[in-house]
């Protein structure tokens, strides 16, 4: 299990983790000097179930929300920290909104610094927290009043975390491996090490992977999973990979890179999403507004084009297309957060629907029908509508990449027809394919009726006459 903290600056997140685990997280000299968390901290502890639980300590200051977002991606549970003396503060609310946008549905609340206030104040803040959570997906999350200084209440929270670790289901190992890089450093005698959370699949020593948007080939020389040496690691674990590659330099690796198998490598600058504007926003969201995108550990600027109108009211959702200033890696179902142009305010977020979004015809009824189908969680649920709207069939390799579903894990309906073209296989609904055959024959008959003295048309002329909308390789396969 991976637990991430959330909460306002100076509410005691780092102190609480130290009290829970007895371990001081990774901290920079500047953090020790200033007494605040600036970047992400990592530590591991056995909570009693025999396996290490990973903790990610995130900064609470509003200037470092981008670091908090990098740490929150891929966690199983959030530990929301609220100080009893301060109560709810701006970053409490923003961190909670981010956690909900990222789809995190397990939370424990630590009500810290109770040794500094009267019992009435503790109850007052507890009620505030309950009201804050009541309308969202984390309603009825347990609240633990405690003091990291005296130790009061810490054991109860530790036991609750241990119990939760037993409830968290191991993530599926199906799919290709990908890891969101949050750190890279050099170890004497070993070379370059990258760390991050494994989002999908599994990896083993000796595997070949691609690094970053450039797709630089690297080999896994060694690895740690949940801070322990291992031969394999898989989705849902914190992983450190010792990697090597031709002319690979530490300066070429940065937070935001992905380390993944070749089948998933598809950098993109256009992503269609299911976007939700936070209800606390004071004004409508306007089409083509500049935004900051946070996905995994990536942080990229761009603009958001609304696909169903020119503006969106607070609390509402709509299809939208991100047009980015730099390429990213994005798969169907990935959770994302959008902040304003100055990165001062969280606007909303949502899910990736299509990581290879079209630049043209993005608002047509047919395209919106495809996006409606892509709101489904699984490939099997989305496939019937996608097939019905695909004039030239579906590229199965693109579906493999978009849904991270290797072909051996597919369950295609019997009526689906797979056609081999010069560009590779295409999938058609059987009804659609046989309708194309009829259109082809009808076009050929019409040609001979209208031009009885001419010889039969050549291939390209027949395509223009009968099925001009069909791509040439698909038409050749139809013949």
Locations of the language-model features?
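Conserved G1/Walker A P-loop phosphate-binding module
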Residues: 1-58, 62
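Conserved catalytic-core segments of large NTP-driven translation/proteostasis enzymes
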Residues: 114, 131-281
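Conserved nucleotide-binding/hydrolysis micro-motifs of P-loop NTPases
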Residues: 61-62, 85-89, 104, 113-118, ...
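Residue-level marker of beta-strand positions
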Residues: 52, 101, 203, 208, ...
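C-terminal effector modules of nucleic-acid-centric enzymes and ribosome-associated factors
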Residues: 5, 116-122, 128-131, 143, ...
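Conserved catalytic network of the ASCE P-loop NTPase/AAA+ motor domain
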Residues: 9, 36-38, 44-49, 70-74, ...
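Conserved Switch II/interswitch segment of TRAFAC-class P-loop GTPases
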Residues: 51-53, 58-63, 72-96, 100-124
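Residue-level signature of catalytic and energy-coupling elements of molecular machines
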Residues: 10, 16, 35, 57, ...
């Amino acid at each position: 299990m991976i637990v991430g903290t959330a909460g306002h600056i100076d509410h005691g997140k780092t102190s609480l983790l130290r009290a829970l685990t007895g371990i001081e997280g990774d901290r920079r000299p500047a953090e020790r000097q200033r007494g605040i968390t600036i970047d992400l901290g990592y530590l591991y502890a056995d909570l009693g179930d025999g396996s290490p639980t990973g903790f990610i300590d995130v900064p609470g200051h509003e200037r470092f929300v981008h670091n908090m977002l990098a740490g929150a991606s891929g966690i199983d549970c959030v530990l929301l920290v609220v100080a009893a003396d301060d109560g709810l503060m701006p970053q409490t609310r923003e961190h909670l909104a981010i956690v909900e946008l990222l789809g995190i549905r397990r939370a424990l609340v630590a009500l810290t610094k109770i040794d500094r206030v009267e019992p009435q104040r503790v109850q007052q803040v507890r009620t505030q927290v309950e009201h804050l959570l009541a309308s969202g997906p984390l309603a009825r999350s347990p609240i633990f009043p405690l003091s990291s200084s005296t130790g009061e209440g810490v054991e109860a929270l530790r036991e609750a975390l241990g119990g939760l670790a037993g409830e968290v289901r191991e993530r599926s190992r199906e799919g290709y491996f990908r890891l969101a890089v949050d750190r890279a450093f050099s170890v004497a005698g070993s070379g370059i090490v990258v760390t991050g959370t494994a989002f999908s699949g599994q990896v083993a020593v000796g595997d070949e992977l691609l690094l970053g948007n450039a797709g630089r080939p690297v080999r896994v020389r060694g690895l740690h999973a949940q801070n322990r040496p291992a031969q394999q690691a898989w989705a849902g674990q914190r992983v450190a990979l010792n990697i090597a590659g031709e002319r690979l330099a530490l300066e070429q690796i940065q937070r935001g890179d992905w380390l993944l198998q070749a089948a998933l490598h598809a950098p993109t600058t256009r992503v269609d999403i299911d976007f939700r504007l936070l209800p606390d926003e004071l004004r409508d969201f306007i089409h083509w507004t500049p935004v900051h995108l946070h996905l995994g550990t990536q942080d990229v600027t761009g603009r958001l084009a609304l696909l169903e109108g020119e503006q969106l009211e607070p609390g509402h959702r709509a299809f939208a297309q991100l047009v980015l200033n730099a390429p990213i890696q994005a798969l169907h179902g990935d959770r994302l957060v959008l902040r304003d142009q100055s990165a001062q305010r969280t606007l909303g977020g949502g899910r990736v629907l299509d990581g290879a979004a079209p630049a043209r015809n993005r608002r047509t009824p047919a395209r919106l029908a495809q996006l409606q189908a892509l709101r489904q969680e699984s490939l099997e649920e989305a496939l019937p509508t996608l097939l019905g709207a695909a004039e030239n069939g579906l590229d199965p390799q693109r579906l493999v990449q978009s849904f991270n579903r290797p072909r051996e894990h597919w369950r295609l309906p019997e009526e689906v027809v797979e056609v081999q073209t010069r560009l590779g296989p295409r999938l058609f609904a059987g009804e659609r394919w046989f309708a194309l055959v009829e259109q082809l024959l009808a076009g050929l008959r019409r040609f001979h009726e209208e031009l009885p003295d001419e010889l039969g048309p050549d291939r390209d002329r027949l395509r223009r006459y009968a099925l001009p909308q069909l791509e040439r390789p698909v038409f050749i396969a139809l013949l």
